[in-house]
Structures are given as C-alpha cells and as structure tokens.
C-alpha cells in the first residue's frame, strides 16, 4: 500500500463487462480513466454512450454527454456511493486506514501480482455489494471486480496509457 501512496497521477483505458442474471451476454462499456492524487478520479465512458463520472474530494459529478444533464452528489450524504468511491480512491491513494473504515480488508500476493479483497462493513453497502476485488502489479491497478449482493457482477480491466 505504501508504494501506491507514492503515485501522483495515472491514466488508462478500461473495458467493463457487467454480468446480469437476466441477460445471456454481458453489457460492455469502454473509455478512459484518470487519477490525480490525492482525491480526483475521472471515468469517461466513450461507448456505448458518452458519460463521465468525476470524483473530486467529497463530490461526485455524473454527466451524460448526450442529454447534457449533470448531477452532483455529496459523498457523506450518500453512504453507499461514498463507500464505493473510497474503495477505489483509497486503494489508489494507498490509504489503508480509510479502507478499513469502510471494509474488511484482505491483501494477497506480492508486489508483482497482488489482489485486494474488500468486504463492506456498513449494512447499507452490504445490501448493494458483497465484495470488491482489485488486482494489480506494482503500483498499477489493472482489474476491478464488484460482486453485487444479488449475484450480478462487473469486471473492469484497465490498461495503462503511456505518460
């Protein structure tokens, strides 16, 4: 976790697949991700529609490019969203103390190939997600998997963009 805390910024491309019990094939989306320490994370979905999620401090902004609609949420007023956001952001920050505030944390592997399992401790968040799994190599997070409480799941694979 200490090494992750040293990363000041990172950029990558993602492909996310959502596996829903009611569908035979996964839903797929793709786009770009950008991180700037300590608290800014941007997810720009480019396909199948253009949408942006920007986490900056304690605010999450959701913007639909097609409709022009923009919504802003304060994390502390939305505990489930806050928990999800901190699961990703605190991992990128190497902030184990904050992770433990929201999750039971288990780290496996070594620096070259690691896996972090996060089990929500907050009851409302447990109703949404059973577990979040992040995997990486060195200071790069290359995989995020969210296992929802109802059995659906999403897998996100992240490839690094050259700086």
Question: Positions of the model-derived regions?
Answer:
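An acidic-aromatic
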Residues: 32-83, 154
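Gly/Pro-enriched, hydrophobic low-complexity segments
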Residues: 96-163
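Residue-level recognition of well-ordered beta-strand positions that form the cores
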Residues: 13-15, 32-34, 44, 117-119, ...
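Amphipathic hydrophobic-ligand
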Residues: 25-31, 131, 152
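Flexible, processing/modification-adjacent segments and terminal tails
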Residues: 1-19, 24-26, 40, 64-121, ...
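Short, charged/polar low-complexity linear motifs in solvent-exposed/disordered segments
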Residues: 60-62, 70, 80-81, 88-90, ...
